[in-house]
């Protein structure tokens, strides 16, 4: 057998020391010499509480809290909080014990004792805090449907002498006492319900009441749901169509025919603006003339604008 396998069977001990004890190396060394150095580990409670170190999972059979330098447990219990106790419960093997090194485990005061119980530890008859051992067991659950005692196609399903199927380890076991479970294959009495029969014509013609949460708020237009059934989607669609029709109507009113275009198109020979002075220059042009800034040109001469550059 390998040395690692031998050490794995030896109980492991974890010593948790308060900071005050580390200030006295002689006393700490005396406590460490009481345990085999191959099977014991030492951790400082303050470093564990600060999250600077972490404990391995399911490793130790015994976790010992060392008392303070003055022999009390004030400093240890102050540092042992919920996070530390959760790590202790996790690092203990099932059946592992947590106590003080002098055996005064019952002296662990509140709230540390309550936090230890909430972390998963329980108190035994000696007052020690122990990590419980959860045994694996199978539970028999009868699975049966009591209907008529029939068989399908020569297969007798109503056999009560069949042995239950025992599954391995902690898996729920079902007993095979199914009484005519396939009886529904012969004739199903369930009838399909016509959805149209659930609502009459009066209910269909009734106006849809819009829920308060679907009503648009002031200053904000609410979007309809993807599967809208309250009528908001139809209302918004009608509003969009009405606005589009109004916009098209206004746009058509601004359209000019060929004759009207010729009246204001100065590139057509013989056509001038209402003032008749657009081609004479800025001195003769109106304030709103589109040709302000252009040099004088002859009536009928083509004028193009490219990037604010005038080309005649």
From Swiss-Prot:
Span list, region N-terminal SAM-like domain: 7-139
Residues spanned by motif Cx2C motif 1: 275-278
Region (Fe-S binding site A): 214-230
GO BP terms, alphabetized: iron-sulfur cluster assembly
Pfam annotation, one family: DRE2_N
Motif (Cx2C motif 2): 286-289
Keyword Oxidoreductase attached: no
Tagged with keyword Lipid metabolism: no
Quaternary data: Monomer. Interacts with TAH18. Interacts with MIA40.
Family: Belongs to the anamorsin family.
Entry text on domains: The C-terminal domain binds 2 Fe-S clusters but is otherwise mostly in an intrinsically disordered conformation.
Function: Component of the cytosolic iron-sulfur (Fe-S) protein assembly (CIA) machinery required for the maturation of extramitochondrial Fe-S proteins. Part of an electron transfer chain functioning in an early step of cytosolic Fe-S biogenesis, facilitating the de novo assembly of a [4Fe-4S] cluster on the scaffold complex CFD1-NBP35. Electrons are transferred to DRE2 from NADPH via the FAD- and FMN-containing protein TAH18.
Name assigned to this protein: Fe-S cluster assembly protein DRE2
Organism (species): Arthroderma otae (strain ATCC MYA-4605 / CBS 113480)
Name of the gene: DRE2
């Amino acid at each position: 057998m390998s040395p690692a396998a031998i050490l794995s069977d030896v109980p492991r001990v974890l010593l948790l020391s308060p900071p005050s004890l580390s200030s006295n190396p002689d006393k700490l060394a005396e406590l460490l010499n009481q345990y085999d150095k191959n099977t014991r580990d030492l951790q400082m409670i303050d470093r564990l509480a600060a999250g600077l170190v972490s404990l391995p999972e399911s490793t130790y059979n015994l976790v010992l809290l060392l008392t303070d330098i003055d022999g009390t447990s004030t400093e240890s219990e102050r540092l042992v909080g919920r996070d530390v106790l959760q790590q202790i419960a996790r690092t203990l093997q099932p059946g592992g014990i947590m106590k003080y090194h002098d055996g005064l485990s019952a002296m662990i005061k509140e709230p540390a004792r309550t936090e230890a119980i909430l972390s998963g530890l329980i108190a035994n008859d000696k007052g020690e805090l122990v990590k419980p051992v959860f045994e694996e067991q199978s539970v028999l659950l009868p699975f049966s449907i009591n209907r008529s005692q029939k068989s399908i196609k020569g297969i007798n399903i109503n056999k009560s002498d069949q042995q239950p199927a025992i599954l391995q380890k902690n898996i729920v076991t079902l007993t095979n006492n199914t009484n005519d479970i396939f009886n529904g294959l012969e004739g199903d009495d369930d009838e399909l319900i016509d959805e149209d029969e659930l609502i009459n014509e009066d209910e269909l013609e009734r106006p849809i009441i819009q829920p308060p949460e679907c009503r648009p708020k002031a200053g904000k237009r609410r979007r309809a749901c993807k599967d809208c059934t309250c009528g908001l989607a139809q209302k918004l669609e009608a509003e969009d169509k009405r606005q589009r029709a109004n916009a098209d109507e206004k746009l058509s009113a601004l359209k000019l025919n060929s004759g009207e275009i010729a009246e204001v198109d100065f590139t057509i020979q013989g056509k001038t603006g209402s003032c008749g002075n657009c081609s004479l220059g800025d001195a003769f042009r109106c304030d709103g003339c589109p040709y302000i800034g252009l040099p004088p040109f002859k009536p009928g001469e083509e004028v193009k604008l490219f990037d604010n550059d005038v080309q005649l």
